[in-house]
C-alpha cells in the first residue's frame, strides 16, 4: 500500500465558552459568514468552501466543566485535511492501519465523509473527503433540513467501506448520507 497525501487544508474546529463572542470576532477579522448555527455548533466560511471554522459551545456541551477538565478545555479541537476522493481516503486508512495507526472515529457528516485520528500527544485531526462535487451543493445541504436534524453525522465502518469500494461499489453510492441513519455520538476530546 502506498502513501496517499491530502490535497488541501480544510478547516479548524475550536472549543469555546465564549461562543457568540468568537463568532463575532471571526466574522469581523475574516469577513466570515455563518453557514449553519444552532446553540451548540456553528460553521463559518470566508470563501467558497462549505466551512473553514467550526465552533463547539462548551457552555452547553460541558456546562459544569472547568478549564482543567480534559473534556472542557477551550482551544483547538482538531484540524482537518481534504483528500481527493473516497478511494484515496480509504487507501490512506489501509496504509496507516498497516503501520498500526487507526482512527478513533469514522463519521459521515453529510457534507464530508471523515476519519478522525489522534497523534501521540493526543492532537486530533480529521481526514475527509467532500460528499458533494461543488461547494454550492455542499452549502445547500448545510442550509437544508437534513443537516439541521443531524449536524454531527452517522458512524460508519471503514473496513466495510474499504471492502465495498474494492468490490466495485461506486463512490457516489457511499458519499450521500441517508436521512434514516442514526445520529452518531461525538467522539474524541468532547466524548464523556
Give, region by region, the residue ranges found by the protein language model:
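Short, P/G- and charge-enriched loop/turn segments at secondary-structure junctions
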Residues: 1, 66-67, 103
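A detector for short, charged/polar N-terminal pre-domain segments
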Residues: 1-2, 164
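N-terminal "first-domain core" detector
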Residues: 5-47
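Vicinal oxygen chelate
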Residues: 7, 15-21, 73-74, 79-124, ...
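Histidine-centered active-site/metal-ligand motif
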Residues: 11, 50-53, 63, 78, ...
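Short N-terminal helix-initiation segments at or just after the protein's N-terminus
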Residues: 15-27, 56-67, 162-163
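Conserved short beta-strand elements that form part of the metal-binding/catalytic scaffold
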Residues: 33-73, 118, 124-132
Amino acid at each position: 500500500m502506498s502513501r496517499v497525501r491530502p490535497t488541501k487544508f480544510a478547516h479548524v474546529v475550536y472549543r469555546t465558552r465564549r461562543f457568540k463572542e468568537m463568532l463575532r470576532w471571526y466574522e469581523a477579522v475574516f469577513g466570515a459568514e455563518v453557514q449553519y448555527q444552532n446553540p451548540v455548533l456553528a460553521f463559518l466560511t470566508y470563501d467558497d468552501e462549505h466551512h473553514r471554522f467550526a465552533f463547539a459551545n462548551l457552555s452547553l456541551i460541558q456546562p459544569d466543566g472547568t478549564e482543567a477538565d480534559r473534556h472542557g478545555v477551550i482551544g483547538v479541537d482538531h484540524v482537518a485535511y481534504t483528500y481527493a476522493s473516497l478511494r484515496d481516503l480509504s487507501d490512506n486508512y489501509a496504509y496507516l492501519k498497516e503501520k498500526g495507526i487507526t482512527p478513533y472515529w469514522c463519521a459521515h457528516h453529510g457534507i464530508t465523509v471523515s476519519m478522525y485520528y489522534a497523534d501521540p500527544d493526543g492532537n486530533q485531526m480529521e481526514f475527509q473527503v467532500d460528499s458533494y462535487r461543488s461547494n454550492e451543493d455542499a452549502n445547500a445541504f448545510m442550509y437544508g433540513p437534513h443537516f439541521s436534524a443531524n449536524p454531527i453525522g452517522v458512524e460508519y465502518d471503514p473496513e466495510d467501506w474499504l471492502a465495498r469500494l474494492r468490490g466495485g461499489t461506486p463512490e457516489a453510492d457511499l458519499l450521500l448520507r441517508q436521512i434514516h441513519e442514526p445520529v452518531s455520538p461525538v467522539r474524541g476530546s468532547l466524548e464523556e
